[in-house]
């Protein structure tokens, strides 16, 4: 599809580009502007709008399209409003201008992760409302802050609040990842983020000496053990074509800290690791493994967790799950190929699943390179619009799932 001039641009694309220009970029997102944007959109669409301040300055905006049968549980469409930082010098276009090139690619931070999805939800609801539809189940759209830094001042708090329980969510959709092939990836579980800092203490002294028991030597041993484990998991993934990235445990060494001068042996050094633990791992045994690598390195080597998710959940992807049945039926009817996978990263879906709500991670972008968090993050307007079509089919099906035992 070739690009149209601005006067011919699809209004859904225009709204998408407007949202992309709001600078909700970490570490200082302009959440006020995002909330105002959704309030205004709610007004235009005739949707209920509720603001829940889960922490000072951290507002969850809830837009609601009531269903015809209030006894049924609702459909929750979640998206986060924050985006990750940019390295502006590596971008072909200003990442907050939402520039559209002559082919129709829209360049912006958040184009894939996940401002596209927020607008696709809204535009699908708009279309269905304009066509005069009503569905039995209520549809709530939640726009949440803070996901990109862990969701601790966003969804993690929101799911504990009475306002969340009052939504009576029976099923949720949240973000997925683009797929470069013709297929669409859908995520039914997630790896658990474990952020681990290993601190090593040892003998300080003059750096000209062969000092024994130094912090660096012991830290080196732990780093070796963990990177050997990384290599093992990588080989396991490489050698088995049936395994996807989310099915093995990954780890990266992301920070090294310590030292004051070239010629002073420091008494303390630390290494930080980002583990993503596969859902089928025995968590207790895995933690013991980490502890034993530290112990094997010598005295004075300890670890602490900056993040340690312990509640991985799996949403069934067979017809025993009526939500999956409805979701996959629509995709089949639309001739979309689905690739069910475990999310390699972490999303707010982990909090939603942990309070007992089945959830899928889905960002309808096929034939699209995976550019989330990358330079030149972009999405073709035709792929974006196709996503609106997909939600326009998914929402009626999900919001019409007949009464379930869990609804009463
Ligand atoms: C682990 S906190 C979540 C932040 C981000 N979504 C990630 O997966 O890294
Ligand atoms: Zn995201
Ligand atoms: Zn992200």
Curated annotation (Swiss-Prot):
It is found in: Cytoplasm. One of its GO terms (molecular function) is identical protein binding. Changing residue 147 to D: Decreased protein stability. Loss of enzyme activity. Its EC number is 3.5.1.14. Zn(2+) 2 binds at residues 113, 148, 373. Binds 2 Zn(2+) ions per subunit. Its main location: cytoplasm. It catalyses: an N-acyl-L-amino acid + H2O = an L-alpha-amino acid + a carboxylate; N-acetyl-L-methionine + H2O = L-methionine + acetate; N-acetyl-L-glutamine + H2O = L-glutamine + acetate. Zn(2+) 1 binds at residues 80, 113, 175. SUPFAM superfamilies: Bacterial exopeptidase dimerisation domain, Zn-dependent exopeptidases. Changing residue 381 to D: In a breast cancer sample; somatic mutation. Expression is highest in kidney, strong in brain and weaker in placenta and spleen. It holds the Pfam family Peptidase_M20. The keyword Metal-binding applies. Keywords: Cytoplasm, Disease variant, Hydrolase, Metal-binding, Zinc. Its cofactor is Zn(2+). Catalyzes the hydrolysis of N-acetylated amino acids to acetate and free amino acids. Homodimer. Interacts with SPHK1. Belongs to the peptidase M20A family. It is linked to Aminoacylase-1 deficiency: An enzymatic deficiency resulting in encephalopathy, unspecific psychomotor delay, psychomotor delay with atrophy of the vermis and syringomyelia, marked muscular hypotonia or normal clinical features. Epileptic seizures are a frequent feature. All affected individuals exhibit markedly increased urinary excretion of several N-acetylated amino acids. This is Aminoacylase-1. It comes from Homo sapiens (Human). The lineage of its organism: Eukaryota, Metazoa, Chordata, Craniata, Vertebrata.
């Amino acid at each position: 599809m070739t690009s149209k001039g601005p006067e011919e641009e699809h209004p859904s694309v225009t709204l998408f580009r407007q949202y992309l220009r709001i600078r909700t970029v970490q570490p200082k997102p302009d959440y006020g502007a995002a909330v105002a944007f959704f309030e205004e959109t709610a007004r235009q669409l005739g949707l209920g709008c509720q603001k829940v301040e889960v922490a000072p300055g951290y507002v969850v905006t809830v837009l609601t399209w009531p269903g015809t049968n209030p006894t049924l549980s609702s459909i929750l469409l979640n998206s986060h409003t924050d985006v990750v930082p940019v390295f502006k010098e590596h971008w072909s276009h200003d990442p907050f201008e939402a520039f559209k090139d002559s082919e129709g690619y829209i360049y912006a931070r958040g184009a894939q992760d996940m401002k596209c999805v927020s607008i696709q939800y809204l535009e699908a609801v708009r279309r269905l409302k304009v066509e005069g539809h009503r569905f039995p189940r209520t549809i709530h759209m939640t726009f949440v802050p803070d996901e990109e830094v862990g969701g601790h001042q966003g969804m993690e708090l929101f799911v504990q609040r009475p306002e969340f329980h009052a939504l009576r969510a029976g099923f949720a959709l949240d973000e997925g990842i683009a797929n470069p092939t013709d297929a669409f990836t859908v995520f039914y579980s997630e790896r658990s983020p474990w952020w681990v800092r290993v601190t090593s203490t040892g003998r300080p002294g003059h750096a000209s000496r062969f000092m024994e028991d130094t912090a660096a030597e012991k830290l080196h041993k732990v780093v070796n053990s963990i990177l050997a484990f990384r290599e093992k998991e990588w080989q396991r993934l490489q050698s088995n074509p049936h395994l996807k990235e989310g099915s093995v445990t990954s780890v990266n060494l992301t920070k090294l800290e310590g030292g004051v001068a070239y010629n002073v042996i420091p008494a303390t050094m630390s290494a930080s690791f980002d583990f993503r633990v596969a859902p089928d791992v025995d968590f207790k045994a895995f933690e013991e493994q980490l502890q034993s690598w530290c112990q094997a390195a010598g005295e004075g080597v300890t670890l602490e967790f900056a993040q340690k998710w312990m509640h991985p959940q799996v949403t069934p992807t067979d017809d025993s799950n009526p939500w999956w049945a409805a979701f996959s039926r629509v995709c089949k009817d639309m001739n979309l190929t689905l690739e069910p996978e475990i999310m390699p990263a972490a999303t707010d879906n982990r909090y939603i699943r942990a309070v007992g709500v089945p959830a899928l991670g889905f960002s309808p972008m096929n034939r699209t390179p995976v550019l989330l968090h990358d330079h030149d993050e972009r999405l073709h307007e035709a792929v974006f619009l196709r996503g609106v079509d997909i939600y326009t089919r998914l929402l009626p099906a999900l919001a019409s799932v007949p009464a379930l035992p869990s609804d009463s």
